[in-house]
Amino acid sequence: QEAEFAILHDPVFEQVMLVGEGRPFVVLLAVTQETDENVLIRRANDKLRDFPRWTRVRRVIVQKEPWSVNNGLLTPTLKLKRKVTLDNFARELAGLYE
């Protein structure tokens, strides 16, 4: 989660989650208004330059709608429900890892 906090220091990202454990590469789930995947990858990796190489982002899934308690992705204390978020993006993630 430290890597996610580092990425959030870039104002282009509103909310982020890194996915990569047990997978061939890291995908960034991001709430942002930016749509250019190459720009997002570059900006995220700029923030991750002091982290191990395996944390480097190779793909991005963008969502415009913020994650919230109402859509079930945040707890009442505004913590990310990681499992629910993974389930929510399962189809998109499967497509990237095929």
Model-derived segments and spans:
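Conserved C-terminal "lid"/linker of ANL adenylate-forming enzymes
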Residues: 15, 47-98
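AMP-binding/adenylate-forming catalytic core of the ANL superfamily
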Residues: 1-55, 66, 71
